[in-house]
Amino acid sequence: MARRDRVIITIGGTGVGPRNRTPEATEPHIDTLLPGLMTQILFSGLSNTAQAGLSRGLVGLSSRDSTAALIVNAPSSSGGVRDALGVVCPLFGSIFERL
């Protein structure tokens, strides 16, 4: 994040398996969790498959100022990525206008 990336999307590693550690790896970089967006992504996924409930992905901001990056953990499935992007992409402007 040294280059001041504004959006960081990880794909995969959000499941319940022992090698799925993406939320644990990204959590130290998140200053403010956005549980509403996590819930929206979950609901979007659940409308397609019950397996969406197994994702542990996080969504949050690295800070609450003009240098903030939005961090999104998307599942590895193409449907999970579509769900996550379908929720967060339309909100980029609203999120960054408030910082």
Question: Where are the regions that the model predicts?
Answer:
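Non-catalytic beta/alpha edge segments that cap or flank active sites
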Residues: M1-L99
